């Protein structure tokens, strides 16, 4: 069984060599005190933001190679949907069957509250940012990208990472929650409000 320390020993130097210049060019410290990931499902873009002098700065973007499902939040186990909302990380998995993975804290308190209110007893679980190029409800980033992201999260501390997951970029087009659950406008408004802080 591999440990996080094993992964740092294997991939740390190459990841640092790639990430340090990106952070320096953006005007951010490396490793940062905190980071924000923004995952855009429609655009299949994964943004990495870090604290700058006064405002967050965009450090890097990676393509999302696979994300199953379509627009709309994850509601139940097996629906193949990628979650939407404001999340934190729950840990790092150095022994993933998808090379390496980073666990998202889905379902969070918001998800659990609405699942309980609607009688959904199995809202799903085990949502990861991972390697490889296939996904069922997770974000598949490919192996080279997940090696860098894994090292970045390990160096930053997974408890210092925020994850914003949206159907598309609310900074460019306002939320259109028609046709979803009754609580979807509330969720999208919160996501859009948080995303406003991350603009170049």
Q: Which residues does each predicted region cover?
A:
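Short, flexible beta-strand-to-coil junctions
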Residues: 39-43, 105-107
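Acidic helix-start/capping segments at beta-turn-to-alpha-helix junctions
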Residues: 42-43, 63-69, 166-171
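Primarily extracytoplasmic ectodomains and periplasmic/lumenal surface modules that are beta-strand-rich
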Residues: 43-47, 53-56
């Amino acid at each position: 069984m591999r440990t996080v320390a094993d992964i740092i020993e294997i991939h740390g130097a190459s990841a640092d060599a790639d990430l340090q210049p990106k952070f320096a060019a953006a005007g951010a410290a490396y490793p940062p005190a905190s980071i924000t990931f923004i995952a855009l499902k429609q655009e299949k873009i994964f943004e990495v933001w870090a604290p700058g002098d006064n405002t967050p700065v965009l450090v890097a973007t990676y393509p999302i190679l696979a994300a199953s499902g379509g627009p709309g939040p994850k509601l139940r186990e097996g629906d193949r949907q990628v979650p939407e909302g404001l999340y934190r990380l729950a840990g790092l998995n150095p022994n993933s069957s998808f090379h390496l993975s980073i666990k998202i804290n889905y379902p969070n308190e918001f998800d659990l509250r609405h699942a309980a209110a609607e009688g959904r007893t199995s809202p799903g679980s085990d949502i990861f940012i991972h390697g490889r190029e296939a996904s069922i409800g997770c974000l598949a980033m490919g192996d080279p990208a997940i090696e860098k992201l894994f090292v970045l999260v390990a160096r930053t501390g997974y408890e210092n990472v925020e994850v914003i997951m949206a159907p598309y970029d609310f900074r460019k087009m306002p939320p259109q929650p028609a046709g979803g659950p009754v609580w979807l406008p509330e969720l999208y408004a919160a996501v859009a409000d948080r995303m406003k802080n991350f603009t170049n």
